[in-house]
Amino acid sequence: MENDAGESVDLYCPRKCSASNRIIHAKDHASVQLNIVDVDPETGRMTVGSKTYAICGEIRRMGESDDCIVRLAKKDGLITKAF
């Protein structure tokens, strides 16, 4: 599709599940997206860094979303490996 300036634009950009790498379809209303921000330990305010995780409805239906989020957060260094 093109806009008024003649540039090609997409109406829908599909997301991928962070845990299973599946494409999250537009009709997957059970999927969630979590934005976890970095917090300054002294002031308690949000800094510029953040991490986004998208979990598809299939993972949530199986009850594995909490394990997947912990695994992804460990991999990104948000929580300790001994958690």
From Swiss-Prot:
Gene3D superfamilies: 3.30.1230.20. GO terms for molecular function: structural constituent of ribosome. It is found in: Cytoplasm, Cytosol; Cytoplasm; Rough endoplasmic reticulum. GO terms for cellular component: cytosol; ribonucleoprotein complex; ribosome; rough endoplasmic reticulum. GO terms for biological process: translation. It comes from the Eukaryota. Keywords: Cytoplasm, Endoplasmic reticulum, Ribonucleoprotein, Ribosomal protein. It holds the Pfam family Ribosomal_S21e. The keyword Cytoplasm applies. InterPro entries: Ribosomal_eS21, Ribosomal_eS21_CS, Ribosomal_eS21_sf. Its main location: cytoplasm. PROSITE patterns: RIBOSOMAL_S21E (PS00996). The keyword Endoplasmic reticulum applies. PANTHER family: 40S RIBOSOMAL PROTEIN S21. Belongs to the eukaryotic ribosomal protein eS21 family. Component of the 40S small ribosomal subunit. Interacts with sta. This is Small ribosomal subunit protein eS21. It comes from Ceratitis capitata (Mediterranean fruit fly). The gene is RpS21.
